[in-house]
Amino acid sequence: HIPKGDVPRDDVEEECEKYEASIKKAGGIDLQILGIGKTGHIGFNEPGSGSDSRTRRIALDTVTRRDAAADFFGEDNVPTEAITMGVATIMEAREIAIVATGEHKAAIIKRAVEGEPDPDVAATYLQQHPNAVFYVDFASGADLTRIRTPWVIGEVKWNREREIDAVIWLGETTGKSVLKLDENDYREHHLSALLARHGKAGPLNGEVFNALIAKIRGRSKLPAGKKVVVFSPHPDDD
Protein backbone atom coordinates (compact mmCIF):
# COMPACT_ATOMS: atom_id res chain seq x y z
CA HIS A 1 0.00 0.00 0.00
CA ILE A 2 2.43 2.62 -1.22
CA PRO A 3 2.04 5.27 -3.92
CA LYS A 4 2.86 3.96 -7.39
CA GLY A 5 6.11 5.47 -8.52
CA ASP A 6 5.94 4.30 -12.12
CA VAL A 7 2.78 6.03 -13.33
CA PRO A 8 3.07 8.34 -16.37
CA ARG A 9 3.83 11.93 -15.44
CA ASP A 10 0.45 13.15 -16.71
CA ASP A 11 -1.31 10.70 -14.37
CA VAL A 12 0.63 11.51 -11.18
CA GLU A 13 -1.85 14.01 -9.75
CA GLU A 14 -4.77 11.62 -10.27
CA GLU A 15 -2.79 8.77 -8.70
CA CYS A 16 -2.02 10.91 -5.64
CA GLU A 17 -5.70 11.76 -5.22
CA LYS A 18 -6.61 8.07 -5.49
CA TYR A 19 -4.05 7.21 -2.85
CA GLU A 20 -5.46 9.77 -0.41
CA ALA A 21 -8.97 8.47 -1.12
CA SER A 22 -7.91 4.87 -0.48
CA ILE A 23 -6.58 5.83 2.96
CA LYS A 24 -9.88 7.48 3.88
CA LYS A 25 -11.85 4.52 2.52
CA ALA A 26 -9.83 2.19 4.76
CA GLY A 27 -10.71 4.27 7.81
CA GLY A 28 -7.36 6.00 8.10
CA ILE A 29 -3.95 4.71 9.18
CA ASP A 30 -3.66 3.04 12.59
CA LEU A 31 0.14 2.85 12.74
CA GLN A 32 2.59 4.74 10.54
CA ILE A 33 6.17 3.43 10.72
CA LEU A 34 8.80 5.84 9.44
CA GLY A 35 12.50 6.16 8.96
CA ILE A 36 14.25 9.53 9.00
CA GLY A 37 16.70 10.88 6.45
CA LYS A 38 19.82 12.91 7.14
CA THR A 39 17.95 16.05 6.12
CA GLY A 40 15.14 15.18 8.53
CA HIS A 41 12.77 14.07 5.82
CA ILE A 42 9.98 11.63 6.62
CA GLY A 43 8.67 9.79 3.62
CA PHE A 44 10.16 11.98 0.91
CA ASN A 45 9.03 15.23 2.49
CA GLU A 46 12.21 17.13 1.74
CA PRO A 47 13.23 20.49 3.27
CA GLY A 48 10.52 23.07 2.61
CA SER A 49 7.59 20.66 2.91
CA GLY A 50 4.62 22.33 4.57
CA SER A 51 2.61 20.89 7.44
CA ASP A 52 -0.48 20.87 5.19
CA SER A 53 1.17 18.92 2.35
CA ARG A 54 -0.55 15.87 0.89
CA THR A 55 0.50 12.96 -1.31
CA ARG A 56 2.34 14.49 -4.26
CA ARG A 57 5.31 14.38 -6.60
CA ILE A 58 8.45 15.93 -5.15
CA ALA A 59 12.00 16.60 -6.32
CA LEU A 60 14.56 14.66 -4.29
CA ASP A 61 17.24 16.49 -2.34
CA THR A 62 20.88 15.89 -3.32
CA VAL A 63 21.63 14.37 0.10
CA THR A 64 18.69 11.98 -0.23
CA ARG A 65 19.80 10.84 -3.68
CA ARG A 66 23.37 10.36 -2.48
CA ASP A 67 22.20 8.26 0.48
CA ALA A 68 20.14 6.06 -1.86
CA ALA A 69 22.99 5.55 -4.34
CA ALA A 70 23.96 2.12 -3.01
CA ASP A 71 20.45 0.80 -3.65
CA PHE A 72 20.55 1.98 -7.28
CA PHE A 73 24.14 0.99 -8.11
CA GLY A 74 25.32 4.59 -8.28
CA GLU A 75 24.02 8.09 -7.72
CA ASP A 76 23.47 8.64 -11.44
CA ASN A 77 20.82 5.92 -11.38
CA VAL A 78 18.81 7.38 -8.49
CA PRO A 79 15.53 8.99 -9.62
CA THR A 80 15.38 12.77 -9.32
CA GLU A 81 11.73 12.73 -8.26
CA ALA A 82 9.44 10.58 -6.15
CA ILE A 83 5.83 10.35 -5.01
CA THR A 84 5.46 10.75 -1.28
CA MET A 85 2.76 10.88 1.34
CA GLY A 86 2.48 14.44 2.59
CA VAL A 87 3.20 15.66 6.10
CA ALA A 88 -0.52 16.17 6.77
CA THR A 89 -1.26 12.67 5.48
CA ILE A 90 1.31 11.18 7.84
CA MET A 91 0.17 13.26 10.80
CA GLU A 92 -3.38 11.89 10.48
CA ALA A 93 -2.19 8.42 11.50
CA ARG A 94 -3.40 7.41 14.95
CA GLU A 95 0.08 6.28 16.00
CA ILE A 96 3.49 7.05 14.52
CA ALA A 97 6.74 5.18 15.14
CA ILE A 98 10.04 6.62 13.91
CA VAL A 99 12.99 4.22 13.79
CA ALA A 100 16.64 5.29 13.49
CA THR A 101 19.98 3.56 13.98
CA GLY A 102 23.61 4.58 13.61
CA GLU A 103 25.75 7.53 14.62
CA HIS A 104 25.22 9.19 11.24
CA LYS A 105 21.63 9.89 12.33
CA ALA A 106 22.56 11.41 15.73
CA ALA A 107 22.57 15.06 14.68
CA ILE A 108 19.23 14.92 12.87
CA ILE A 109 17.58 12.92 15.67
CA LYS A 110 18.57 15.63 18.13
CA ARG A 111 17.15 18.32 15.87
CA ALA A 112 13.95 16.38 15.20
CA VAL A 113 13.30 15.71 18.89
CA GLU A 114 14.60 18.90 20.50
CA GLY A 115 14.48 21.55 17.76
CA GLU A 116 11.60 23.90 17.01
CA PRO A 117 9.08 22.73 14.37
CA ASP A 118 10.64 23.75 11.08
CA PRO A 119 9.55 23.26 7.43
CA ASP A 120 13.19 22.59 6.59
CA VAL A 121 13.15 19.52 8.88
CA ALA A 122 9.87 17.71 8.31
CA ALA A 123 10.48 15.31 11.21
CA THR A 124 10.13 18.19 13.68
CA TYR A 125 6.40 18.29 12.89
CA LEU A 126 6.08 14.95 14.68
CA GLN A 127 6.52 16.74 18.00
CA GLN A 128 2.97 18.00 17.51
CA HIS A 129 1.50 14.51 17.14
CA PRO A 130 -0.19 13.20 20.31
CA ASN A 131 1.09 9.65 19.85
CA ALA A 132 4.44 9.70 18.05
CA VAL A 133 7.42 7.79 19.45
CA PHE A 134 11.06 7.81 18.34
CA TYR A 135 12.78 4.41 18.61
CA VAL A 136 16.54 4.93 18.44
CA ASP A 137 19.64 2.96 19.34
CA PHE A 138 22.36 4.42 21.54
CA ALA A 139 24.41 5.65 18.57
CA SER A 140 21.62 7.59 16.87
CA GLY A 141 20.39 8.98 20.19
CA ALA A 142 23.85 9.93 21.45
CA ASP A 143 23.43 13.68 20.83
CA LEU A 144 20.14 13.98 22.72
CA THR A 145 20.50 16.19 25.78
CA ARG A 146 19.31 13.43 28.12
CA ILE A 147 22.18 11.26 26.85
CA ARG A 148 24.92 13.71 25.92
CA THR A 149 24.53 16.25 28.75
CA PRO A 150 21.97 14.90 31.26
CA TRP A 151 23.22 17.30 33.96
CA VAL A 152 21.60 20.14 32.02
CA ILE A 153 18.09 18.80 32.60
CA GLY A 154 18.16 17.12 36.01
CA GLU A 155 19.87 15.08 38.69
CA VAL A 156 22.63 12.74 37.55
CA LYS A 157 24.05 9.53 38.99
CA TRP A 158 27.73 10.29 38.71
CA ASN A 159 30.44 7.75 37.96
CA ARG A 160 34.01 8.18 36.75
CA GLU A 161 33.17 7.88 33.05
CA ARG A 162 30.36 10.42 33.28
CA GLU A 163 32.56 12.83 35.25
CA ILE A 164 35.21 12.67 32.54
CA ASP A 165 32.59 13.25 29.84
CA ALA A 166 31.20 16.24 31.74
CA VAL A 167 34.57 17.90 32.23
CA ILE A 168 35.52 17.39 28.58
CA TRP A 169 32.17 18.87 27.54
CA LEU A 170 32.72 21.82 29.88
CA GLY A 171 36.10 22.49 28.33
CA GLU A 172 34.65 22.35 24.82
CA THR A 173 31.73 24.59 25.81
CA THR A 174 33.87 27.24 27.52
CA GLY A 175 36.77 27.03 25.09
CA LYS A 176 39.17 26.32 27.94
CA SER A 177 41.67 23.55 28.49
CA VAL A 178 40.74 21.10 31.24
CA LEU A 179 43.34 22.40 33.68
CA LYS A 180 42.10 25.99 33.33
CA LEU A 181 38.48 25.35 34.27
CA ASP A 182 37.43 27.10 37.47
CA GLU A 183 34.58 26.88 39.97
CA ASN A 184 32.49 29.49 38.16
CA ASP A 185 32.67 27.48 34.94
CA TYR A 186 31.13 24.51 36.73
CA ARG A 187 28.45 26.57 38.46
CA GLU A 188 27.43 28.44 35.31
CA HIS A 189 27.04 25.26 33.25
CA HIS A 190 24.79 23.10 35.45
CA LEU A 191 27.69 21.21 37.05
CA SER A 192 27.45 22.47 40.62
CA ALA A 193 26.60 18.95 41.83
CA LEU A 194 29.75 17.56 40.24
CA LEU A 195 31.82 20.35 41.78
CA ALA A 196 30.32 19.62 45.20
CA ARG A 197 31.46 15.98 44.93
CA HIS A 198 35.07 17.11 44.64
CA GLY A 199 35.06 20.34 46.63
CA LYS A 200 37.20 22.34 44.22
CA ALA A 201 37.78 22.45 40.49
CA GLY A 202 41.54 21.89 40.67
CA PRO A 203 41.60 18.29 41.92
CA LEU A 204 38.80 17.26 39.55
CA ASN A 205 40.50 18.92 36.60
CA GLY A 206 43.71 17.10 37.49
CA GLU A 207 42.00 13.72 37.69
CA VAL A 208 40.40 14.14 34.28
CA PHE A 209 43.61 15.45 32.75
CA ASN A 210 45.54 12.44 34.06
CA ALA A 211 42.86 10.08 32.77
CA LEU A 212 43.14 11.57 29.29
CA ILE A 213 46.93 11.37 29.35
CA ALA A 214 46.71 7.73 30.43
CA LYS A 215 44.53 6.97 27.41
CA ILE A 216 46.99 8.65 25.08
CA ARG A 217 50.01 6.91 26.59
CA GLY A 218 48.28 3.65 27.40
CA ARG A 219 49.33 1.73 24.31
CA SER A 220 51.29 -0.67 26.52
CA LYS A 221 47.96 -1.87 27.92
CA LEU A 222 46.69 -2.94 24.50
CA PRO A 223 46.74 -6.68 23.71
CA ALA A 224 50.12 -7.74 22.38
CA GLY A 225 51.06 -11.09 20.89
CA LYS A 226 47.43 -12.22 20.97
CA LYS A 227 44.95 -13.28 18.33
CA VAL A 228 42.21 -10.77 17.56
CA VAL A 229 38.92 -11.67 15.87
CA VAL A 230 37.14 -8.93 13.87
CA PHE A 231 33.50 -9.88 13.40
CA SER A 232 32.40 -7.12 11.02
CA PRO A 233 33.34 -3.68 9.68
CA HIS A 234 31.78 -0.53 11.06
CA PRO A 235 28.15 -0.37 9.84
CA ASP A 236 28.82 3.01 8.19
CA ASP A 237 31.60 1.54 6.04
CA ASP A 238 29.32 -0.20 3.54
Regions found by a protein language model. Give the residues of each.
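Active-site rim/loop-helix segments in enzyme catalytic domains that contact anionic ligands
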Residues: 167-238
